[in-house]
Every structure is written in C-alpha cells, then in structure tokens.
Regions:
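Conserved PDZ fold ligand-binding element
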Residues: 213-218
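Serine-dependent protease modules
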Residues: 1-192, 199-200, 209
C-alpha cells in the first residue's frame, strides 16, 4: 500500500473479499517512495477466508506501452472494493510528494499516468494489466484536482527491491526509516579534489546543532 495511507494511523485493519477482518501491523514503510507493507497474523485468518485469497502476480511495468489497457482496483471513497478501467496515458512521469512534476533526472519515483479513475480510497490498490498482473500501485495523493483523467500509479518494477526489503522487516510500530544526518554538504569529485587540494568524498559546509553529525563530532 502507500505510506500516506498508514501514516498517522493508530490501528490498522485488513478486510478481505468475504468481509472478514483482522488487525494488521506495519512491516515497513518508505516515505520517500510513498510505500508501506502491512501484515495480518495468519493464525487469525480462517481457512474459509484463506481459500478466497488470490496472490497477486507482479508484472513488468517496463514492458507497458502507452495505450495499453489497465485496471485500477481500490476502495474508492470507502464504498467498498471497486474497479475502474482506462489506458496508460504516459510513462516515466516524476512528481514530488506535493504532486509537482519533476525533471526526468530527478530522484523522484517513476510513475505511470493513466486515465483510469483513481479517487480517494484507491490509494495503495493495484494497477493491473490485462493479464491480471500488477504493474503499478495507485496513489490518489498524486491525482490531479484541476483536470479529469489524470491518475498516477507507482511503477512496480522500479520499487520491487524496496518492497522486498520492507516485506522482510519485523512487524512494528510505525517509525520513519529515513534518518537525518544533519549536515549541509556537497560531493567532492576527482576533478574538484585535485583543483582544491582536498580529499574525495563529501565536503561539509554546515552542521546542524544537536543533530546526529554534531553529536558524532563532525
């Protein structure tokens, strides 16, 4: 699911297709990529419910083409599970967490743009290709409020490694996985190293008082 879905939640519940629910815990989150993995204890899931659960197959979002048909699954507006259909409108879109488009060279997560309706409640749901494979994770947080037909999903192939890492973490209370070093600095290239006569690495220009770097004596 998305990090912004679970962010700030005191309790989590997973509801299955048969209406049965179990309490869930967070296994891991990545706020930069807006990803989260939650887990429900198998001991609390009845066999009758397990029989109805189908494991999603991950597709290759790199192979999707503009114009391909896709299906978005979610819980739009909290009314229950629903699906919408559309096409891949564009690939390799990049936006920051405020929905502002970024340059192609940006470190922002790769997004698939689609005209399939992605409304509040669809966040964290799957964007499927016509083979039923997951090619994206829908994010209503990035949906445009100014125009219609512009929804976004996180390209699954770009975040598979991150999801694997989060899945292997131990269930816990939510914490931010990203630490803060507490410096302002710049990389020192080989060319800059020779020009200024300083070692390669990172040049620290400022240290935040009381930050981790300050406490470490940097």
């Amino acid at each position: 699911t998305n990090n912004h879905v679970v962010e700030g939640s005191s309790t989590l519940t997973v509801t299955f297709i048969d209406g049965k629910s179990v309490k869930a815990d967070i296994k891991g989150t990545d706020s930069d990529k807006d990803l989260a993995v939650v887990a429900g204890p198998l001991s609390e899931i009845k066999d009758s419910t397990m029989d109805k659960i189908a494991v999603a197959t991950l597709g290759n979002s790199d192979q999707t083409q503009v114009g391909d048909q896709v299906i978005a699954i979610g819980n739009a507006l909290g009314y229950g599970q629903s699906v919408t259909t559309g096409i891949v409108s564009a690939k390799n879109r990049k936006m920051n967490d405020e929905g502002i488009e970024q340059d192609e060279d940006s470190d922002a997560t790769n997004l698939i743009q689609t005209d399939a309706a992605i409304n509040p409640g669809n966040s964290g749901g799957a964007l499927l290709n016509m083979d039923g494979e997951v090619v994206g994770i829908n994010s209503a947080k990035l949906a445009s409020t100014e125009v219609e037909g512009m929804g976004y999903a996180i390209a699954i192939s770009d975040v598979t490694d991150t999801l694997e890492q989060l899945m292997n973490e131990t269930p816990r209370d939510k914490v931010d996985n990203h630490g803060v070093l507490g410096i302002t600095g710049m990389s020192v290239s080989d060319e800059a190293s020779q020009y200024y006569g300083v070692p390669e690495g990172v040049l620290v220009s400022e240290v935040t008082d009381g930050g981790a770097a300050d406490k470490a004596g940097i």
